[in-house]
């Protein structure tokens, strides 16, 4: 009963992740894998104290983590695990004056063996073609090059 209450509260925030899984695997396959706990979707707040061994871990929307949250997440990685962290530093929604853990991680972890960064541009957008044009327009307005 308690678990359902937590799930009911956090599900709206995790909706984009569910949508991506449904698009990739289909509803039934996703549901089956979640019932078997092969796939677990959990808010970052519930990671403290855990060690995730033999797992493929995804932290989505990481631009909105604080430096403390990012460090906590990164130190959950256990043996046999890989982690992928995604985020768009042009879409930070943190309160003014709060630093992004994703930006800090880029600086702190640059050059650390076993860690790699991949950067995408408007050309990598896999949404409606108009979205690519919107991103390019914002980049031009901010003085960025394609």
Regions found by a protein language model. Name each.
Residues 1-6:
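Short, small-residue-biased leader/transition segments that mark boundaries at the very start
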Residues 7-41:
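Mechanochemical coupling/switch segment within NTP-driven translocation systems
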Residues 35, 40-62, 132, 138, ...:
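Helicase P-loop NTPase motor core of nucleic-acid translocases
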Residues 38-39, 53-56, 70, 80-85:
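Loop/turn-to-beta-strand initiation segments
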Residues 50-52, 63-72, 77, 94-97:
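Conserved ATPase-coupling elements of RecA-like P-loop NTPase cores
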Residues 61, 87-88:
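Walker B catalytic acidic pair
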Residues 94-112:
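Short regulatory helix/loop adjacent to the ATP-binding pocket of P-loop NTPases
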Residues 106-146:
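Conserved coupling/interface region of RecA-like P-loop/ASCE motor cores
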